[in-house]
């Protein structure tokens, strides 16, 4: 209270602003009522009325100043402290708990925000903290709240563990856990690439084909580096020759090579690129046996087909890195039956060949195309190669079926050529020659009414011309004007 008395002296200066109410304020300062002769009584009354006002103002100023002092004391932070202190009590109280608690407990607020900002979660978290001291772990580290959501194993060991030391260990152990899920995560992407399941329709043996796809999905999680894909396909060919040449062995052979490459490629981890590279070769093999089984010369061709597939697969890998169509013709010449090597180049040809040869196969293989295009780059990179089919017309059916699809997949030029080839156009000679141009005076009916009055037609009729004559003349004029246009 000793402080308020000094402020009253300053209040007199503030009163001057209110003087607009009347000149009385100066009279109090200069007590003489004589200066204002007209209203001396008023001046005497005003000071008596204004004195309480001054006192009230001084009280208001004192209150305001006190408020400012209270703000300087920063009681607001103290008010916020008790809330954090409550959480401190639940967690841990150290010698320097004041600053440390504030600094360490601010993250829990972030944790609450991450948790969703629901007030209900806070007491639940505090209860867990009271049960086990691991609560400080999330407090000290904001990311920890996220970890419990991903892997609950982290927070569970923490309660048994002591304070931050073990909590940090648990968090470190919990952090590697997320990468592990990321490692198994690749299997979901791998299932789309495995196109072997659709293969069964091409080859009679379905059970054996169904069994191989399962192992690749299991082994594929480790699949990562793409560079090795080209090398692994080469080893699989040796296992292919051992099978016997007979047609019955052919189907088994087609199945066995598939099993071998499926198990081998996953080891040299070629996840995205190899499955498209290797699988087309596999597709070519089942297609070739199907064709060969139907054709009479089945026994002789079996040995040659195994060697060509590795070449086309390697060529396909190289073509994806740098497009090189020539290897395909070489493979075509080397193989006794050219159609099988072509499919590895692009999956689109497989379906086109499957349509003429095996009737049941087109549906599943069409699904294969969608799956392959879905995984991504393989479909886009295979677009340019489709040109070769026209170069190597192995069979009329295959070449005809491949040309339209391949050209449509090529650039716009091929599409334009196909579009024009669908229609027959007449030459300039087929059309009748235009009428010869003869200069003549032209009369435009639109200009006639402008030059003459609206009653010109009536005048013309009066002159002896009937409306029919006028109409015939106009029609003739319009006919003459048409050729000029």
Curated annotation (Swiss-Prot):
<feature type="modified residue" description="Phosphoserine">
    <location>
        <position position="211"/>
    </location>
</feature>
<feature type="short sequence motif" description="Profilin-binding motif">
    <location>
        <begin position="3"/>
        <end position="8"/>
    </location>
</feature>
<feature type="compositionally biased region" description="Pro residues">
    <location>
        <begin position="263"/>
        <end position="278"/>
    </location>
</feature>
<dbReference type="GO" id="GO:0043014">
    <property type="term" value="F:alpha-tubulin binding"/>
</dbReference>
<feature type="short sequence motif" description="WASP-binding motif">
    <location>
        <begin position="424"/>
        <end position="448"/>
    </location>
</feature>
<keyword id="KW-0597">Phosphoprotein</keyword>
<keyword id="KW-0488">Methylation</keyword>
<feature type="modified residue" description="Phosphoserine">
    <location>
        <position position="392"/>
    </location>
</feature>
<keyword id="KW-0009">Actin-binding</keyword>
<feature type="short sequence motif" description="Profilin-binding motif">
    <location>
        <begin position="11"/>
        <end position="16"/>
    </location>
</feature>
<keyword id="KW-0744">Spermatogenesis</keyword>
<keyword id="KW-0217">Developmental protein</keyword>
<protein>
    <recommendedName>
        <fullName>WAS/WASL-interacting protein family member 3</fullName>
    </recommendedName>
</protein>
<feature type="compositionally biased region" description="Pro residues">
    <location>
        <begin position="1"/>
        <end position="41"/>
    </location>
</feature>
<dbReference type="InterPro" id="IPR028290">
    <property type="entry name" value="WASH1"/>
</dbReference>
<feature type="compositionally biased region" description="Pro residues">
    <location>
        <begin position="212"/>
        <end position="246"/>
    </location>
</feature>
<feature type="compositionally biased region" description="Basic and acidic residues">
    <location>
        <begin position="415"/>
        <end position="439"/>
    </location>
</feature>
<feature type="compositionally biased region" description="Pro residues">
    <location>
        <begin position="296"/>
        <end position="312"/>
    </location>
</feature>
<feature type="short sequence motif" description="Profilin-binding motif">
    <location>
        <begin position="31"/>
        <end position="36"/>
    </location>
</feature>
<dbReference type="Pfam" id="PF02205">
    <property type="entry name" value="WH2"/>
</dbReference>
<feature type="compositionally biased region" description="Pro residues">
    <location>
        <begin position="176"/>
        <end position="203"/>
    </location>
</feature>
<feature type="domain" description="WH2">
    <location>
        <begin position="56"/>
        <end position="73"/>
    </location>
</feature>
<dbReference type="GO" id="GO:0045202">
    <property type="term" value="C:synapse"/>
</dbReference>
<feature type="region of interest" description="Disordered">
    <location>
        <begin position="1"/>
        <end position="485"/>
    </location>
</feature>
<keyword id="KW-0221">Differentiation</keyword>
<dbReference type="GO" id="GO:0034314">
    <property type="term" value="P:Arp2/3 complex-mediated actin nucleation"/>
</dbReference>
<dbReference type="InterPro" id="IPR003124">
    <property type="entry name" value="WH2_dom"/>
</dbReference>
<feature type="modified residue" description="Asymmetric dimethylarginine">
    <location>
        <position position="57"/>
    </location>
</feature>
<keyword id="KW-0963">Cytoplasm</keyword>
<dbReference type="GO" id="GO:0007283">
    <property type="term" value="P:spermatogenesis"/>
</dbReference>
<feature type="short sequence motif" description="RLRK">
    <location>
        <begin position="69"/>
        <end position="72"/>
    </location>
</feature>
<dbReference type="GO" id="GO:0071203">
    <property type="term" value="C:WASH complex"/>
</dbReference>
<comment type="function">
    <text>May be a regulator of cytoskeletal organization (Potential). May have a role in spermatogenesis.</text>
</comment>
<feature type="compositionally biased region" description="Polar residues">
    <location>
        <begin position="392"/>
        <end position="405"/>
    </location>
</feature>
<feature type="modified residue" description="Phosphoserine">
    <location>
        <position position="161"/>
    </location>
</feature>
<dbReference type="GO" id="GO:0003779">
    <property type="term" value="F:actin binding"/>
</dbReference>
<comment type="subunit">
    <text>Interacts with WASL, and monomeric and filamentous actin.</text>
</comment>
<feature type="compositionally biased region" description="Low complexity">
    <location>
        <begin position="247"/>
        <end position="262"/>
    </location>
</feature>
<dbReference type="GO" id="GO:0005769">
    <property type="term" value="C:early endosome"/>
</dbReference>
<dbReference type="GO" id="GO:0030154">
    <property type="term" value="P:cell differentiation"/>
</dbReference>
């Amino acid at each position: 209270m000793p402080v308020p008395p000094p402020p009253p002296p300053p209040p007199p200066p503030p009163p001057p602003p209110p003087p607009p109410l009347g000149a009385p304020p100066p009279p109090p300062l200069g007590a003489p009522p004589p200066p204002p002769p007209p209203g001396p009584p008023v001046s005497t009354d005003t000071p008596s009325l204004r004195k309480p006002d001054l006192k009230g103002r001084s009280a208001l100023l004192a209150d305001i100043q006190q408020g400012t002092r209270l703000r300087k004391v920063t009681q607001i932070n103290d008010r916020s402290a008790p809330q954090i202190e409550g959480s401190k009590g639940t967690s841990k109280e150290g010698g320097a708990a004041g600053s440390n608690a504030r600094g360490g407990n601010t993250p829990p607020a972030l944790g609450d925000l991450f948790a969703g900002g629901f007030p209900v979660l806070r007491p639940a978290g505090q209860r867990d903290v009271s049960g086990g001291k691991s609560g400080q772990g999330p407090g000290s580290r904001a990311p920890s709240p996220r970890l419990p959501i991903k892997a609950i194993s982290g927070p569970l060991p923490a309660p048994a563990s002591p304070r931050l030391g073990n909590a940090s260990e648990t968090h470190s152990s919990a952090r590697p856990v997320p990468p592990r899920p990321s490692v198994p995560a690749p299997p979901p992407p791998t299932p789309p690439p495995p196109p072997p399941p659709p293969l069964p329709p091409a080859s009679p043996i379905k059970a054996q084909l169904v069994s191989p796809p399962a192992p690749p999905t299991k082994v594929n999680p480790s699949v990562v580096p793409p560079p090795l894909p080209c090398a692994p396909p080469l080893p699989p060919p040796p296992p292919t020759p051992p099978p016997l040449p007979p047609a019955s062995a052919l189907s088994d052979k087609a199945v066995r090579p598939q099993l071998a490459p499926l198990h081998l490629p996953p080891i040299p981890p070629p996840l995205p690129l190899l499955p498209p590279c290797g699988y087309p070769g596999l597709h070519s093999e089942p297609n070739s046996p199907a064709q060969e089984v139907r054709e009479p010369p089945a026994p002789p061709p079996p040995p040659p087909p195994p060697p060509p597939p590795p070449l086309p697969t390697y060529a396909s890998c190289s073509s994806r890195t740098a497009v090189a169509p020539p290897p395909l013709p070489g493979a075509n010449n080397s193989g006794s039956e050219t159609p099988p090597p072509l499919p590895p180049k692009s999956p689109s040809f497989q379906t086109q060949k499957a349509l003429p040869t095996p009737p049941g196969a087109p549906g599943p293989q069409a699904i294969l195309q969608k799956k392959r295009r879905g995984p991504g780059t393989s479909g886009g990179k295979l677009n340019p190669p489709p040109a070769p089919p026209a170069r190597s017309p192995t069979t009329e059916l295959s070449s005809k079926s491949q040309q339209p699809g391949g050209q449509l997949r090529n650039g716009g030029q091929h599409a334009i050529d196909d579009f024009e080839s669908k229609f027959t156009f007449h030459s300039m000679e087929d059309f009748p020659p235009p009428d010869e141009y003869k200069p003549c005076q032209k009369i435009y009916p639109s200009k006639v009414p402008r030059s003459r009055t609206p009653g010109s037609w009536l005048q013309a009729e009066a002159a002896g011309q009937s409306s029919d004559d006028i109409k015939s003349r106009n029609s003739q004029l319009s006919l003459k004007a048409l050729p000029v246009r």
